Amino acid sequence: MDPSLVLEQTIQDVSNLPSEFRYLLEEIGSNDLKLIEEKKKYEQKESQIHKFIRQQGSIPKHPQEDGLDKEIKESLLKCQSLQREKCVLANTALFLIARHLNKLEKNIALLEEDGVLAPVEEDGDMDSAAEASRESSVVSNSSVKKRRAASSSGSVPPTLKKKKTSRTSKLQNEIDVSSREKSVTPVSPSIEKKIARTKEFKNSRNGKGQNGSPENEEEDKTLYCFCQRVSFGEMVACDGPNCKYEWFHYDCVNLKEPPKGTWYCPECKIEMEKNKLKRKRN
């Protein structure tokens, strides 16, 4: 593989990104303007009701209160819809970057393996956001099997670095794992399947575990979620049996807190609905 060809191909691949980003940002800006207008509408109607209550008291009902309430709810629903559209547009932009970046990183790795490109020497003292994002530590497939085996025997490993054992937490960089280690309540396999699983992925910059010894877990470079990036921060697992993404970043699926019960990603929900329709037709 020729580095010059890789560079040329990468430049060609990203040549349309500026126009694509311009369109996405214009759409987000347009939705922002619509949001402002809708907000003005429902705030105006709310002020009418509050003004009447201040003048007449809370006992008498505003003559147009039912109509105003209906219009306020419609405006709020419209705002919610616009916000969702903005999230989809923003995630689309993120996906475009992640896709091109992932392809570039794979090509760089191939060039390094072929010996035509010198590996990048990482400075242990460098404290940049780029380094932190590339060093995000995730669990390997072997650790998943170990955790499942422990769960079947009625116990759960105490460390939060095992996959699918932590309910909630935040991304942490350069911390002492022992100071943040939390206990986990044992969960039986039957109950575990019914719980929407969430996971925290930590990054230990110095590569040491609780006792200062090198970590035995291999770095998992598997790509998850719609954005096709590695695991980091707060993530939730899809309970769909055939989900091709498995894990999702909270921001990519518009989650702020762990879902209760089983949770399915948008694609699995659509697939489930299709299967229901097929069964009804048959």
Curated annotation (Swiss-Prot):
Biased composition (Basic and acidic residues): 191-203
Main subcellular localisation: nucleus
Keywords, comma-separated and alphabetical: Cell cycle, Chromatin regulator, Coiled coil, DNA damage, DNA repair, Meiosis, Metal-binding, Nucleus, Phosphoprotein, Zinc, Zinc-finger
Gene Ontology molecular function: histone H3K4me3 reader activity; methylated histone binding; zinc ion binding
Entries under CDD domains matching the protein: ING_ING3_Yng2p, PHD_ING
UniProt GO cellular component terms: cytosol; NuA4 histone acetyltransferase complex; nucleosome; nucleus; piccolo histone acetyltransferase complex
Compositional bias of kind Low complexity: 129-143
InterPro entries attached to this UniProt entry: ING_fam, ING_N_histone-binding, Zinc_finger_PHD-type_CS, Znf_FYVE_PHD, Znf_PHD, Znf_PHD-finger, Znf_RING/FYVE/PHD
Compartment(s) of residence: Nucleus
Residues with Phosphoserine modification: 183, 188
Coiled coil: 35-86
Composition bias, Polar residues: 204-214
GO biological process, one term: chromatin remodeling
Region (Disordered): 123-217
Task performed by this protein: Component of the NuA4 histone acetyltransferase complex which is involved in transcriptional activation of selected genes principally by acetylation of nucleosomal histone H4 and H2A. The NuA4 complex is also involved in DNA repair. Involved in cell cycle progression and meiosis.
Family in the record: Belongs to the ING family.
UniProt domain comment: The PHD-type zinc finger mediates the binding to H3K4me3.
Subunit details: Interacts with H3K4me3 and to a lesser extent with H3K4me2. Component of the NuA4 histone acetyltransferase complex composed of at least ACT1, ARP4, YAF9, VID21, SWC4, EAF3, EAF5, EAF6, EAF7, EPL1, ESA1, TRA1 and YNG2.
Full protein name: Chromatin modification-related protein YNG2
Annotated source species: Saccharomyces cerevisiae (strain ATCC 204508 / S288c)
